[in-house]
Amino acid sequence: KMVEEALKYNNVESILEEGDEMDIFGPEFTEILEDIKMPTSKLEILIKLLRRQITEYGKTNQVAAKKFQEMLEATIKEYHDRRKFLSEEEAGKTQEETAESIIKNATEQALNILKGMQADRESFRKLGLTFEEKAFYDILIHLRDENNFVYGKDENVDGIVVNEKCKSLAR
């Protein structure tokens, strides 16, 4: 059974190595991920594909890619820290259960990052901008927030913060 699971993992690994583009936002990817029963393998594949997708996203939208990269690195760091510092009680009889819980938690966080990226990638439509204009819009909002200056008024439209002045500049 474990050998069979390892072979499934190797098939996904070979896709990664060949450099074939895998749509991690499509239902096929979700099915592939659900088929992987080994939690550590699932997490590793998810992290590798997220890193690749974040790098690709950064070619168009560096601000959003940086945000997602920071979220992913924080997830990975938390995962490693929790594994490293298992309490003695956790390291006893329940070590395997605790390790599985840690892996499951990290996988859920990585999947949330994936969902956030998907929502961000589609948000340009709700803003009425092109994909490239949305990237520029994100830069304007980021610089405004980073430098603490007021520019226009933010409104929440369908769960997305919209600033009409920044939006008109992005066009």
Give, region by region, the residue ranges found by the protein language model:
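Catalytic cores and motor modules of nucleic-acid processing enzymes
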Residues: 1-171
